[in-house]
Amino acid sequence: MKPRKNHQSISNDDFLIIRLIPNIFTTVGMCIGLTGIRFALESDWKSAVVCVLIAAFFDLVDGLTARMLKATSKIGAELDSLSDAVSFGVTPTVILYLWIVSITQAHNTYMLGWYWIPFIFYSSCCVLRLARFNTTNREASKQDEPKVVSYFVGVPSPAGAILLLTPIILEVNMLRFGHSTTGMIQPFYVCLWVMAVSVLMVSRIPTISLKSIKYKISYRKVIFVLISVILSAAVIIREQWLSLSLAIFIYIISIPIFALYVKRIK
């Protein structure tokens, strides 16, 4: 009987470790997101943006891993929300604000105080959006009504963070092709952009979710799809920032199109 007990205890330990994997991914993503602030303090804007992108990747992976391993838990859901608040609510705010200060070389504390207000608004909207997401998820789990199509209500926080950092991404692309950005980027317009992204996050506009993308591929099209994926990967590797800008543009265009699609099928 004793060997069986030992075997059972080992199995339980292994099971507990497996259940911790999604939470480990969440914590690592948060740490990487916070590292973006460090790079911003060093004026390394590319690395700062990359940290937010990696944090968004880990945010996607931890959810998928939790569902695959059947390791979803209440503490995991709360940890995920707190991590998102840090990685996508605080980090991009600090990065973009420090970037504005650097490009304007503004030392007027009065104007800098005004510039800071939209960023506070963004962080607040991000937290409110996460709170609403948690609440609606709990309510949806109690109901068995099937959805016609899966979607997010408002722009999700990872997408909102990437949208927020679009001015930096555009500057990187302009410098990549030898264009000067001196005097082109005005803090006022950046602040308007921050406000627009903030409103989109807390809006009731349905936005596209990966779960809503369901496309059956026939056997004949497999080769074509694989070739397309390989070519796309090659382009992304060659022009990462240009590809990122294109992806952001496509996502922005998809917002009104997908909203009209959801309205039509309801």
Report residues per predicted region.
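C-terminal membrane-associated helical module and adjoining short loops/tails
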Residues: 1-13, 142-144, 148-266
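Hydrophobic alpha-helical transmembrane segments of polytopic
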Residues: 25, 48-55, 118-121, 125, ...
